[in-house]
C-alpha cells in the first residue's frame, strides 16, 4: 500500500463517523424536504475545511430551499464521481425517525438508505483533505436530493457533472454491484358491474377480478423463465365503496424489479397473458393497465478498464472483489444513461431499508469510508483510467 494512502486510511475516525451518522439520522429529511440533512453534511465539510458548492434543485417555481451538495477535488475534467442521496422515505409509523444505538449498530430512518453511505463519503473526504495530498486528476462527490421520489436531484446533477466512472453508495453490504435491475411501475384498473351485495352473481366484482389478476401475475412470475430474475410487489390496492353493493371499481399499483436480462416487453407479455386468463373468468369486468415508469437495468463487463481504480481500492481497503447485482431501482439508472460506468457500492443491507428496524453497522460504515478514501487516492493519483470501455 502506498504510504500516503495508508496514512489516510489510518486517519478514518470511528468517533467522528458515529457522531455524524447519529446527527444525520436525527435530521428528518424526506424527499422534497431535505434541507436539514444538507445543512448537517455541509456543516461537517465546512468544519473540516472541505470546500463545497450548492446546486439548486427547485421543486416548484421560486423554490430555493432544495439543493445538491457538491465537492470537487483536483482539476477538471473529473475521472471519478461518487454519489449519495440525502433524502429518505417519509415517516409512516409512530416510532419516530431518530437514531438509537445498540453496540455496533445504529438504528433509524435512513440509516442504511443511505445516510450511512453519505457519512462514509463525508469521512473519506475529510480524511483525504486533511492529509493535504493534492489530486492530479479530478474527483467529484455529490450528495443529491429527491432519490426516493422523482430522482430530480440526479437529473439536475448530470446536466453539469459527469465522469467516466460513477459510484453510487446505496446499501450493498459493500458488494461492488456492476449490474443493476430495471424497474417498471404499473397501474392496474378493473371496472366491474354494480349489483346488490346479496346477489353477487348478478354483477361483476372489480375487486375479485383485480385480486385474481394480481395473483395470476405473481404466479406467472414464479415460473420459468422468470425465477430469480423478477421481483413482483403489489404496492397499493383500493376499490369498492361503503354501500351494500358489488364493487364496481378497483385500482392497484404493482412494482416489477427485473434483472438486466428481462425486457419491458417480457413484463408486458406477462401482464397481458394474465389479463387474458382473468378476463375469461370474469367476463363482466373490464381490465386495463398503464405503465407509469420504466427504468432499464444494465450489466457492465467486469473487464472494463474503468474499473481498475475501484479494484485497486478494494485491495487497498482489504476487501474482497466479488461483483454482484443491485436489485432495486436507484439513481444509478439515471447516471447510467449518460454513458458513465455506474457501480453501486455502499454500507448497509437493502433488505432492512424502508423497514421499522432499519439499521447499519458502524464497522461497515467505517469500512466504506476506507474504501471510498482509497478509491479517491487511486483515481486522483498518478494511475488514471482511460475512457475505454
PLM-predicted stretches and their roles:
Residues 2-107, 130, 135, 332, ...:
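Acidic/His- and Gly-rich active-site-bordering loop/insert found
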Residues 1-5, 9-15, 36, 187-389:
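Metal-dependent amide/peptide-bond hydrolase catalytic core
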Amino acid at each position: 500500500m502506498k504510504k500516503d494512502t495508508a496514512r489516510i486510511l489510518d486517519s478514518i475516525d470511528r468517533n467522528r463517523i458515529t457522531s455524524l451518522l447519529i446527527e444525520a439520522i436525527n435530521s428528518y429529511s424526506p424527499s422534497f424536504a431535505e434541507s436539514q440533512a444538507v445543512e448537517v453534511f455541509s456543516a461537517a465539510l465546512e468544519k473540516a475545511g472541505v470546500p463545497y458548492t450548492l446546486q439548486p434543485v427547485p421543486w416548484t417555481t421560486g423554490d430555493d430551499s432544495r439543493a445538491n451538495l457538491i465537492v470537487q477535488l483536483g482539476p477538471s475534467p473529473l475521472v471519478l464521481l461518487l454519489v449519495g442521496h440525502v433524502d429518505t422515505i417519509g415517516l409512516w409509523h409512530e416510532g419516530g425517525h431518530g437514531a438509537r444505538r445498540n453496540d455496533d449498530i445504529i438504528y433509524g430512518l435512513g440509516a442504511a438508505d443511505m445516510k450511512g453511505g453519505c457519512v462514509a463519503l463525508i469521512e473519506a473526504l475529510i480524511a483525504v483533505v486533511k492529509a493535504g495530498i493534492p489530486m492530479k486528476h479530478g474527483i467529484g462527490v455529490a450528495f443529491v436530493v429527491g432519490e426516493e421520489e422523482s430522482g430530480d436531484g440526479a437529473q439536475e446533477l448530470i446536466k453539469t457533472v459527469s465522469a467516466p466512472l460513477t459510484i453510487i453508495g446505496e446499501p450493498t453490504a459493500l458488494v461492488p454491484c456492476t449490474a443493476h435491475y430495471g424497474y417498471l411501475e404499473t397501474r392496474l384498473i378493473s371496472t366491474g358491474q354494480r349489483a346488490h351485495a346479496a346477489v353477487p352473481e348478478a354483477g361483476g366484482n372489480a375487486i375479485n377480478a383485480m385480486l385474481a389478476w394480481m395473483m395470476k401475475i405473481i404466479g406467472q412470475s414464479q415460473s420459468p423463465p422468470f425465477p430469480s430474475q423478477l421481483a413482483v410487489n403489489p404496492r397499493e390496492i383500493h376499490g369498492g365503496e361503503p354501500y351494500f353493493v358489488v364493487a364496481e371499481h378497483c385500482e392497484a399499483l404493482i412494482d416489477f424489479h427485473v434483472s438486466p436480462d428481462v425486457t419491458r416487453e417480457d413484463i408486458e407479455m406477462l401482464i397481458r397473458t394474465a389479463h387474458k386468463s382473468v378476463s375469461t373468468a370474469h367476463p363482466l369486468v373490464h381490465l386495463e393497465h398503464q405503465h407509469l415508469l420504466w427504468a432499464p437495468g444494465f450489466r457492465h463487463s467486469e473487464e472494463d478498464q474503468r474499473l481498475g481504480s475501484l479494484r485497486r481500492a478494494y485491495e487497498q481497503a482489504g476487501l474482497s472483489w466479488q461483483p454482484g447485482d443491485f436489485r432495486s431501482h436507484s439513481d444509478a439508472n439515471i447516471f447510467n444513461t449518460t454513458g458513465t460506468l455506474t457501480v453501486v457500492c455502499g454500507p448497509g443491507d437493502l433488505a432492512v431499508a424502508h423497514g421499522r428496524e432499519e439499521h447499519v453497522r458502524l464497522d461497515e460504515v467505517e469500512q466504506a469510508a476506507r474504501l471510498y478514501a482509497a478509491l479517491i487516492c487511486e483515481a486522483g493519483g498518478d494511475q488514471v483510467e482511460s475512457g475505454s470501455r
